[in-house]
């Protein structure tokens, strides 16, 4: 007779609880949480997931720390105006997690600060696809990136960037103000006025 072999595939997830909310996020091939988070119930957690504390301590945690150090290193060099060392640090972070929002913003800002619009365009295209880029925790980076797109005369990209943000949050008057500023530079006065009025309706 023939023997059937059963193969079991293990998927690793990073699970975090804040208050009553439990969220899980898949681990990428480098063992860091990456990609969209999903909210699950306590019942789901207990029935579908098994804890792996040793794997977390030996594989996941060290990689998460390495990623965090690389991003912080990049931020620190970028703030000092040392854009080439910053780029190297962000690059390293992106080899660990290419979807890391802070590293993508960081390297994008580094390119924009150097006036390297071709490379900034690549990062812009990646960022508009990452929903995480538009979350409140990254608001200051989001704003800085949008302003730098405008200052580098990447007006079309700047507008597309703010429109993408508006798909996820319609009630932020600052987005309409920022769009109006870009449209003023682009000499699109009617759209500029429309967006200013919209901003005023949201925050009279």
Which residues does each PLM region occupy?
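Long, contiguous interaction/recruitment modules in multidomain scaffold/adaptor proteins
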Residues: 1-96, 102, 109, 119-122
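Alpha-helical adaptor scaffolds
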Residues: 102-185
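Extended, charge-rich intrinsically disordered regulatory tails
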Residues: 177, 184, 188, 196-199, ...
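Structural signature of alpha-solenoid helical repeat scaffolds
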Residues: 61, 95, 133-134, 167, ...
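Detector for Asparagine
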Residues: 11, 20, 28-30, 58, ...
């Amino acid at each position: 007779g023939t023997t059937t072999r059963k193969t079991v595939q293990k998927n690793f997830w990073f699970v975090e609880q804040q208050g009553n909310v439990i969220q899980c996020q898949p681990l990428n091939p480098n063992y860091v949480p990456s990609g969209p988070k999903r909210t699950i119930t306590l019942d789901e957690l207990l029935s579908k997931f098994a804890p792996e504390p040793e794997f977390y301590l030996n594989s996941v945690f060290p990689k998460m720390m390495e990623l965090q150090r690389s991003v912080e290193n990049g931020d620190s060099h970028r703030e000092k105006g040392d854009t080439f060392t910053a780029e190297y640090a962000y690059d390293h972070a992106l080899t660990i997690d290419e979807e890391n929002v802070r590293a993508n913003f960081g390297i994008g800002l580094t390119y924009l600060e150097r006036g390297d619009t071709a490379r900034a365009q690549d990062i812009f295209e990646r960022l508009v696809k990452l929903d995480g880029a538009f979350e409140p925790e990254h608001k200051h980076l989001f704003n800085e990136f949008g302003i730098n797109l405008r200052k580098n005369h990447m007006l079309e990209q700047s507008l597309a960037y703010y429109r993408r943000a508006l798909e996820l949050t319609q009630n932020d008057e600052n987005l309409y103000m920022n769009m109006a500023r870009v449209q003023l530079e682009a000499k699109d006065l009617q759209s500029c006025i429309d967006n200013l009025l919209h901003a005023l309706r949201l925050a009279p």
